[in-house]
Amino acid sequence: MTSKDPEPRSGFNGTLINLDIQKVQKIFKTMKNTILVFILTLLSTACANMDRRVHPASATSTRGLADTVGFAHLDWQMDSVMHRINRTFPSELLTAGVQPETAWRVAICPHDDYTYTSWHYPSLLKNLKAKTIIVFGVAHKARQFNIADRIVFDTFTHWQGPYKKIKVSAFREEIMAALPNNLFLVSDSLQRIEHSVEGMLPFVQYFNRDVEIISILVPFMSADRMTQIAAPLASSIHRMMARNRLGWGKDVSLLITTDAVHYGDLEWGGKNMAPFGADSSGYAMAVVKEHNIIDSCLVGGLTVDRIRKFVTTTVRPDDYREYQWTWCGRYSVPLGLMVALNLQQETQGKPLNGKLIGYSTSIDHHPLKVDDLRMGKTAIANLRHWVGYASLGYE
């Protein structure tokens, strides 16, 4: 017997072959339709439950690393990076004049390669004292997933850290449970490839080995949509804090991330992002504009009008998915600050005032040496391709 010409099985007398072909076809058609309906029902149920998808209490999963070049991911790397920052940038670390006992309720931090951003991380994050940090991250790849208009959580129980795994706070489920379904979704896929949250965590853990986090990515959304999300999200956070008797700044803080302007006409995916020109004159004008944005929107008393001014400055009025001025955190910053403003009102806390810790660019100082630490650069830095960095704290 061969596979091409098999013998009939024992007892196979040919009677079955002579069955009514139409009847057999009808049976198979019915079975096919039943299976199709079953599959569609499963898919529909899965989509309907997507927003509430969480791991069972007994399951554990660790969010891995998206960038092992620009960021440290091992304990000895972090120790070396901190030693070099302290040795290389002592004046930058002291310029802000923040007292050691200061505890930020809200902080805005860059997330670029350590070789470029260096001193911004410790000068800001050393005053993040809370055990639970709610992070508002950029969703750089949201367009690939067609995600917009809803904040994005994950289901991971831990994130990879240089000293040990970073626990995801159980408060995440409390916050999600209190939110309307149409305001958020869960996407481990988007969270897994997003680098903005990941970049800050080694420094956060350096200063607090027992820190716990909640990662919230903020994709494309209009200012009006931010307002719709911010109020219930702040209420959910406030109720969680009240139930667990937690203090804002002492036990829970908000950490917002953004890099400032992405400028130049080289290696930006074929785009020209140099409205003032890609030379020294254009650089100077761009930096002036940067400080105008920071001073008029972020430094000093936080108000709704100043937050909305940030949106109109960085987001195109005719298409909220597009840049007006290229801060990658054009959604994470205003939404995070709207949540903070609502939370300040709910907690009846003192007004939030932004303090500029520092501003720099990837080309206004010598990069921190990291190439001997199994680290490096993920992008070039020159007049035709540079990035701005602003770090701010709100006490």
Task: Briefly describe each language-model feature range.
Residues 11-14:
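Residue-identity detector for glycine
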Residues 26-34:
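Positively charged n-region of N-terminal signal peptides that target proteins for export
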Residues 34-43:
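Sec-dependent N-terminal signal peptides
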Residues 342-344, 348-395:
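Long, Lys/Arg- and hydrophobic-enriched amphipathic alpha-helices
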